[in-house]
Curated annotation (Swiss-Prot):
InterPro entries: O_anti_polymase (IPR002760)
One GO CC term, this protein: plasma membrane
Recorded topology in the membrane: Multi-pass membrane protein
A UniProt-annotated Pfam family: O_anti_polymase
Protein name as it appears in the record: Uncharacterized protein MJ0419
Annotated transmembrane regions: 9-29, 31-51, 76-96, 109-129, 144-164, 185-205, 278-298, 306-326, 327-347
Keywords: Cell membrane, Membrane, Transmembrane, Transmembrane helix
Organism encoding this protein: Methanocaldococcus jannaschii (strain ATCC 43067 / DSM 2661 / JAL-1 / JCM 10045 / NBRC 100440)
Localization (cell): Cell membrane
Main location per the UniProt record: membrane
Keyword Transmembrane helix included in the entry's annotation: yes
Amino acid sequence: MLLLHWDNMGKIELHHVFVMLSCIYLIFSDISINSAVVFLFSSIFFYISFTAGKRLYYLIGIDKENLKINLKKHYNFGIFLMIVGLIAVTSDLIWVKDVPLFNPLSRKFLNVYFTTLSHLFLVGWAIVVASSNIDKKKILLYTIIFSILIMLLGYRTNVLVLLISVGAILYYKNKISNREILKYGILVFVILLGLSILRLYALGVEGNPITSRISLTMSIYDIIFNNFNGVFNGYIHYSAVFSYLGLCNGARTVIAKTLGIYNVSITPTIVGAVIGDYGTLAIIPYFGILGIFLGFFYKLAKDVKGIYLGIYGILFAYTLIGIESGILDIDVILYYFFGLILCIYAILLRKLKR
């Protein structure tokens, strides 16, 4: 009966899942009341902004017929990105001369540029799925196979991005129902749990693979909120970009060193990164702009499909993962900018057609 009721519900959207996951993080954490209230407010404000973005799409009145979507070109572009990503994955494994999945300590020897380029495989496959009519069962089979390939690099995030983005794309193409997306979500959680247990086993560490990570991440956020509120003055997000040019440490490493922790990187949560850089009030413009953009892009992607839906699927995944890790990688930031460019292109094309 519960599954039947689930199928009769409307579409589950990003802002729904964002608030739900944020609440889960709060439930499994032990942080100060003030920081908890701000964290919850951030997710609720994102929810409201996302809804406003959807409304804005209707107010502007995008005509998808004017966009002249060529799904074949989008498909070919996706295949090209997959090839580049596959070459990068192979090169990275050759570079490190080990398999980080089974030896997590070897992950620090991966080539940062190969690793970054390997993410194009995820983007390419998302675009291919969004631009083609491949059978649903084949897509899921290929996705599992590709997940095994990607997880060799030892990053759970990449596997999650692949699984979540494909699930979102199939769901918004109406190829899977509410009931099926629930089952798919459970499968993704089981895979995450398995990878987390494998990582702890390889490191010889004991503990709950899920709640211990949530508790640690939220405690870091709590420390930033109470002791480093606005202290970084934009340096965290500066590091997210310029660390790839060798000008500074990565954003998460900067946070770790500030807290006196060395040889590891630390995830500050998406809220913690913003507050650490710009102060508590910065969550209003940050989540306001992010929510409006993603709400608008969601409606555009759902109507147009192709590369629009492919990129939205990737942003869907990174936004949810960003609750813990923050949006602090240059390639991920570029995906958001690419999505923004697609939105601007659709708006300008409408204006020019008038």
